[in-house]
Amino acid sequence: LAKCTGDASHFYCPANPLSLPASLTGLNAASLAATVLVDHATSMFAAPQKSVLPALAGPIGNANSFDWGLPFYYGRRVFMTIEGQTSAIGTGPVYAF
């Protein structure tokens, strides 16, 4: 993905909006297909009427990590257990939705 330049260099700036497939797989082998939307960050920053940027994306410095961002949570019930703590959904870290 093309990275932005200047002040937005920590974000992606693809020439056209992208809809990328992703797959989440749990330790129990359960999996879920998801979609990641990526759009031109600089263009989104220039639209001040938007308070949430659902297609904002950028690298976070580790190929083993991914930040889904706030839009992933819209319309979902998401449950989390803190690392080392036990709950009805297991010993953390656990993410369920």
Segments (PLM) and residue ranges:
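Short coil-to-beta strand junction motifs in C2/discoidin
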Residues: 13-17
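Aspartyl protease active-site motif detector
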Residues: 1-12, 69
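Short conserved beta-strand and strand-loop elements enriched in small hydrophobics
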Residues: 18-29
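Aspartic protease catalytic domain
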Residues: 29-97
